[in-house]
Amino acid sequence: MGKKTVFLTGATGNMGWAGFQELYARKERFDIRILARDSRKNRKMLKPYLADPSVTVVWGDLMRYEDVLSGVAGADYVLHVGGMVSPAADYYPEKTLQVNVGSAENVVKAVLAQPDASEIKVVYIGSVAQYGDRNPPHHWGCASEPQVPAKFDMYALSKICAEQVFASAGLKHFVSLRQSGILYPGILGVLNPTAFHVPMGGVLEWATIEDSGRLLAQVCEDWVPESFWNKAYNISSGAQYRMTNYEFMNRMLGTLGLPSPEKVFEPQWFALKNFHGMWYKDADVLEDVLHFRANVPVDEYFASMKSKLPWFYTLASLAPAWAVKLFMKPVAFAEGLGTQWWVENDPERFEAYYGSREAYDAIRSWDDIRPAPLDKWRAE
């Protein structure tokens, strides 16, 4: 049997790059075709692979149908990972809707234009954001849950609409894999106002970047059963990666050698609701089919992320708590997306994320937002 051709969008993003690496490690079975924007960054990333006959780069744009068609033509698998994500999606909501839905339409149109469209297997990467606000006690769910995006979350709306483009197209082989938060070394250095949109009492079931990349390669293997297709699944690295957002923040700060959240953040900086995230009743369904998890213990994984950071991140541990807090404050007060900017300047967002002025004023200490322990091993 000859090699299969895999067309991958979003290959220079976090998940897409991990998927490309996994596919490249299996290049004896796969030819990999990538659609990438013609930028200096992408040219540098892909330069080591340009001479490899197993890799073809289509320099183009997801919003240009002709470019997408060039990638899809002759492909056995189409992995649509590309699109706009946070934080860019938060700053450019209208463009996010246009790009994420428009690119889905281009991919579907290109697949249906092929003479063997019924044989092409199409994978769409959705998002946990599609489920909307699921704070406890409503924090358990599954892929069949209603999709109700959080207010002002244009990214979530774009992912719902894009998934519907695929689901309603009549494709014979289509699957939506809804991605959760991805753990990768760079996340430890991410700091923008959206960090404070996350309620400390909320939850998320994380997926490692390695598991996510392995998943993209596994789905292209011949042994994937026919019964797998035409469904939606949730992606996660398993029960041990279930955390409250407070627990995650503690782990992240601790990994960087920084003090606890109580010492570097004011509790009022964090929203109380209107985000997304849940723990999955069906967490193992996808794993049972694709076997993509490495099952690295979560503490070991955070330690490995730290070991991969540039050396200067170690300097963070030298900063006293008061200095870290002083550094964080402008982020919470940033114009536009800062939660504390909303207090006086954006009553609609303030109400959506806090509920009311009374609820906001009632946050007097960390005791008011610190969540009680939750049983992460048994769905309620």
Q: Which residues does each predicted region cover?
A:
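Glycine-rich NAD(P)-binding loop of the Rossmann-fold in SDR/ketoreductase-type enzymes
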Residues: 63, 95-106, 149, 153, ...
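NAD(P)H-binding glycine-rich loop region in Rossmannoid oxidoreductase-like domains
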Residues: 49-102
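Alpha-helical substrate-binding/gating segment
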Residues: 185, 190-193, 203-240
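N-terminal Rossmann NAD(P)H-binding glycine-rich loop of SDR-like oxidoreductase domains
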Residues: 4-26
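Mid/C-terminal beta-alpha module of Rossmann-like enzyme folds, strongest
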Residues: 219-289, 299-320, 327-380
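Conserved Rossmann-fold NAD(P)-dependent oxidoreductase catalytic core, especially the SDR/UDP-sugar
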Residues: 84, 102-152, 175
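Conserved beta-loop-beta element that borders a ligand/cofactor-binding pocket
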Residues: 160-186, 227
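Conserved glycine-rich Rossmann-like NAD(P)H-binding loop of the short-chain dehydrogenase/reductase
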Residues: 28-41
